[in-house]
Amino acid sequence: MIKLLYPQFWQERNIIAYLLLPISLIYQFLSYLRTSLACPVILPAKVICVGNCSVGGTGKTQIVIYLAKLLKAKNVSFVIITKAYGSNIKSTTIIQKWHTALEVGDEGIMLAKYGTAIAAKHIKDILPLINELKPDVIIVDDFLQNPYLHKDFTIVSVDSQRLFGNRFLIPAGPLRQNPKQVLDAADLIFLVSSNQDQIPNELTPYIDKVINAQIVPSNNIDKTKNYFAFSGIGNPQRFFLTLENYRLNIVGHKTFPDHYNYLQADLENLYSLAKEHNAILITTRKDYVKFNYLNNKIICLDVELSINNPDLLNEKIFKKA
């Protein structure tokens, strides 16, 4: 799997974006063809799909965790389906405590703490396990662009800082799909940000289904220490902004590609940088799950989702779910 950082031309158009535009048109045609020919699988439970229309982190994982907690509180049986990005998974697997991030993906390890989670590469392989588990609801993480799965309820996550970037499709831009098409079909839109004050113009036509959400720290970290931050997630800028808002003393940071599998050389380099700055290494939960054997040497910033309109979410979810 090719792992890319979010390039600047995905946010602001330049000559590179325009040079890549012909490939984006091919991508658009192939996506249309794939969707047109697909016959969606209807699973024997209500499917809540959490996705986005762009590449990079938009807070999907935190939304899935929020939904899992909500359904559990309401005594609704559910399972979570994750694509297991960054893993070497060969077959559909129910994630267990002994699994590693390399086996089932970093997101899989995180999500399994909140309910039964299945790591799957292909929709067709999920059905036997669903028939065995018999959940009332299936939360699907990042299958929005998959035309082979029927969705009963769709939540679209939008990062309020990046929004839709330069509005070009991959690879000229960050978009997987036309935003209007995605937003028109969505049941709910989560506008995810560390600082929110108003709805962007692009989302005002959908204001009745927009939920403002913040990703906020949920654990206590010593603010008298120096920290060197690193991450291998889709939107590292949000992580660094969260650290800044938490008023931690960040003396430096390093970014890796999304779902990055760290090498020993990477760790040695990070230790060296931290020592140079008399600092402690700090990272995201998604990265932290890859370092179980080093947890005493690395600090994790835990976060959770805080939303401004839980009543709207409850009304929509339990009306359909």
UniProtKB/Swiss-Prot annotation:
Keywords: ATP-binding, Kinase, Lipid A biosynthesis, Lipid biosynthesis, Lipid metabolism, Nucleotide-binding, Transferase. ATP binds at residues 54-61. Pathway: Glycolipid biosynthesis; lipid IV(A) biosynthesis; lipid IV(A) from (3R)-3-hydroxytetradecanoyl-[acyl-carrier-protein] and UDP-N-acetyl-alpha-D-glucosamine: step 6/6. Pfam families: LpxK. Its EC number is 2.7.1.130. GO terms for biological process: lipid A biosynthetic process; lipopolysaccharide core region biosynthetic process. It is an enzyme of class 2 (transferase). One of its GO terms (cellular component) is plasma membrane. The keyword Repeat does not apply. Belongs to the LpxK family. Transfers the gamma-phosphate of ATP to the 4'-position of a tetraacyldisaccharide 1-phosphate intermediate (termed DS-1-P) to form tetraacyldisaccharide 1,4'-bis-phosphate (lipid IVA). HAMAP family: LpxK. This is Tetraacyldisaccharide 4'-kinase. It comes from Rickettsia typhi (strain ATCC VR-144 / Wilmington). The gene is lpxK.
